Each structure stands twice: as C-alpha cells, then as structure tokens.
C-alpha cells in the first residue's frame, strides 16, 4: 500500500493568455484557443485541490512592448480568479522580454519591462516555505543581463539558499538551464554562460531536490548529481519544431496543435521523496460565461516512485535514450542543430505507473544510456537485461561495475548443444553476482515447414510446451548450479493466465524461477494487429497474473506501436506516446489491483458469453475481471461468481478507459449511466468486499 502525501502542489506553464477571446497576434488557430484552454486548466486545478499553484511564466501572449499587454494581464487575472488556492507567478520571456542575446527574435529583458510586470503581477523573483520544504522562484531572464536587478537577485538567492539549506529545496524558473546536457551549447531553449554554470553550482551546493522550468512547450526530464530537472509542456500549444522528435508525420498545424502534448504537473510531496505526475489536458477548453456543465477530471494513477509493487513490465524495443539532432527551423533557432531527447515515452510510462523495463545489454554498454538507466533507477524503475550468447569480457566488466543498476540477466542461446554453455553460464553467474535466466533461441531455420512456404523470424524464450526440454536440460551435470531460472515466450496462440500460472508452478517444483514475455503481435509477420480491444484484453490478463505473482517478472511486448517492418502491431501507446486503450487499462488495474498484489490470488475462470470471467481474492476483497470478445448488455450480465454477493450493498462501476465511475447494483441495475448500456469498454464494479471488472 502507498502512504498519503504530506501535501501537493501543481505547476502550470506557458498559458499565453490573449487580450481578447478567440483572437491572437499569432497566425495559428491553437493560439486563438489559449483563453479557453487556460479556463479548463483552472477547473482542472480546482478538482486536483493542490495546496498551491506555481505558474512558470508566459502568463500572457503579448510581449511587453505591445499596447495590448495590460488588457491581457487583466484577462489573465479574470481567468484565474476562480482558483481555490494560492497562485505564485513567475515571468516568462513574453512577460518581461527574452533572455539576453544579440540574436533572439524579440526584445530582451530590461528594467521598464520588469516594472510593467511588477505592476500587473508582482515581484519577478521570490521564495516561500511550505511544511519542511522551501520553494525558490527565480527570474531566469536576468541571468547574464548585466542589470542591477541581476546582482540584486544573485545576492538575494545566495542568502536565501544558505538560510534554508536544511530544508528540502525546490526551484522554479522559466528558461531551463539545459534540455539534454549541462554542457550543451547555447540555443533558444536554454540558459547561456556564465549564468548557467553559476546557477548549476548553487543547485549542486545546496542539493536542490528538483528544478522545474517551462518555455520549451515540451516535456523533458534529466538528472544531474542529486537534482531532478523537469521541463513542462505548455497548456496552450506545442512548440512544433519539436515534432521532429517523433518518427511519424506531424499532428494538426504541422505539430503545433498536437493535443497529446498539453499538460500540467501535479507534484506530491512525501516525507522522504517527491513524485511528479504530468496530467494531460488534451487541449480541452471552457468557454467564458457559458454555464455549461464542467467535466470531471480523472486523477487515478501512481508514479513508479510511489509504489512498492512492480506489476507488468514492458519491453523497450525502440531507442529510449536517443539524442536527436533537429534541423534549424528559421523560427527560433537558425544557427545550430539543437539536440534533444524524446521523453514522451517516459512520460507515458510514469502516467501508467510502469516500473519494470526490459532492455538489451547494449543499452548498458552505452555510457549515455547507462547514465539514463542510473537516473531512472532513482525514479523507482528496475531494469532487466537480455542478450544473445555468452557475454564478452568487456560486457562482464560492465555488468560487474554496474550490477547495482540491474535486477537480472537473460542469456539466449541456440539449443543444438546446450551442454556446451554450462560452464560459461556458471562462471558468469559467479562473476557478475546477478540472477541468470536462460532463454532458448527460436528461429524459422528450426521451425516446421508449411509446404512450400517459408517466413523469416527470430524469436526467443521457451515455448509453453517445452517444459520437457527444460527438465532434460536440468538433468545435465552442473545445470542446476549454472542458472537461476528460465524465460518463456507467451505467443498470441497461448493464454497468459493459464500458461503463466502453470509454468510458474511447475518451475517452482524444479527449484527455478521464471520470467515471461507476453507478445501482442500476430504469428504472421505480414499481418498487422490493430484490434485495440483484443490488445487491451491481453494486457488486462497479463497485468492480472503479474499482480498475482509478485515475485515473477512478466513483460509485455509491445509498448510503442510497431507501424512498419515485420509483425506490425499496436502497442500500449502510439508513435507519439499517446495512450491507447491498453494503456488506460494498465493504468487503472495498476491503481486498483496493485496495492493488493502481495496477497492476490486467482480463484477461478469461467466462460461469459464469448469471453471469460476471472475471479480474484485478497484479504477483505474479491474481484471479478470480465473479458468479453463482443459488446455485452451489462444489465443482463450473468456471472456465477457474483452469486455469493447478490445481497451486497451497491458497488461502483469503473470505466477502465476513461476512469469514470458510477453506482451499480450487483443484479445489474445501475445508479449511473454505464451499466444498462451496451458497451465495448472496460469496467469495474466495486463495493467494500467486491470488485468486478467488466471489459
């Protein structure tokens, strides 16, 4: 179970409020929607009920030299007036001018611009305490300006940090010090020298817990020494030059109105750590003075830092720490190919609460990726490596040096002469001090031929039918001492629920552990699996069995869509890391079943229409997961496992895609809008002793 946070706060950035409704000085329609999107964010903040909110700047869109600045400022205050908690404001470059540079596209920061901001919004830098934490709001545009205000802020900051050095310190500014590396060259989206190094030295000296910045309208996470560095997305529009990070065509407005890129941060402060949730807004808007019903905000989910259970892991097929050079665009950067990393897959993983990541060993060999592994380890992730054949001496050295980053090593071998690998496997196990799991190579060269047909494939993992092969292997002298367990591949023709439990139990009787790779691809490499309902069912089964076997590592393949090449299929998220149906199901099951995973048992499976029903129990709770293959009328749902609960009090119906909840009686009658309708969605029915999942 997780503990409650001591307090929470939210962070908003780059709202770009216009001086008029549905009118903007920018040529893009997304900018004209800014005011409505800001209103939606205020409504969202009120539902999250943070203790306070910090805005990182670009409060308004008109730059300081425009006569519409004051009008936009008044409208900003009008939009944020309904906010039910304190609001702390920082200036962005649209509010007081660009950072000091001879090439920036707008006027740079100066004293008149700052006085104008102070008139409408207050001080450009400040600090405050909350509980045992200290919050520092920095005017980043002042750095390198040469203004007297820069000297004043520097003296104030040095004294403020020293006075509060025994507190947990969090820092906030508009410009990020960097977006990829502390030593990266200057560009439009970072701080220049010497101000950057000055700030980084202070951050290191006072062991700042996290620094949050905006400006880039994109999501980035980095870690330098003991500090987390976050860059926030905008609530209004995406900086479409960063569409280059995605290896698919741009979204609407050539990427600027990419709805999955908008969001706010909801930060939970615990006694010993913090967890940062990126809450998507999807570009939602609320019109002024319409009186229309306001939508309910769904807040269910855990960050990996918040949970003790692991759940279902994911196989990381795509490069996930790759640094990409982006073309100079002519809009903001014209002299340098800016480098950036696509952190949106990471954002999606944290949104789902994924902890376990399966990586090829070559990720650990790359210093850049290895640093990323180390950073994410601090965020609660665990890493499981795999490789083909016996590792080289260089690989063994790396494994020994960084064994603290790794949970286990899977070694895949050809099965023609497995006895020849016994001594090398034993030597590796003794040397690297890691659990070693053995996996079998499966390829088209060894497969049975279908008449005159031949299809190329390379797979790995023992098939569920090959336990006899394993028993024969373990009968070899020295085999038991050479490895800790075996890896099974659960292909599309195998049932994850029954096979994983059966194989885990059988291997336990042999004194060996198991790992499983559950695939989503079809068996034919030319056919695409794009049935999101079928995929969600499979992810639901794999998640459920993972919670019931907390000491067994189970991974799902695939995380991100494979939309080209062999075995094309949908994953949990699309190529822009927007969640598909399966990602929502994963997140909801992780939230509801995860806290009970230490004592969760699968009690039975029954047929329901053309689908199945899985009964689960833990002390004080019972669950029923229903996986129909077609639409079903929930008001006529007949499940044998419900018979013991027909006299129970009304439960709650959960939609595992939207997170929506409503009351429901166990005989199928509903107190809300969902149960009596035909649905092809994911649901849960719950009371204090019963939860029923309906997919």
Question: Model-flagged regions — what are they?
Answer:
Residues 475-561, 643-646:
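Catalytic-core region of carbohydrate-active enzymes that cleave or remodel glycosidic bonds
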Residues 41-54, 336-365, 375, 379-386, ...:
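Catalytic domains of carbohydrate-active enzymes, especially glycoside hydrolases
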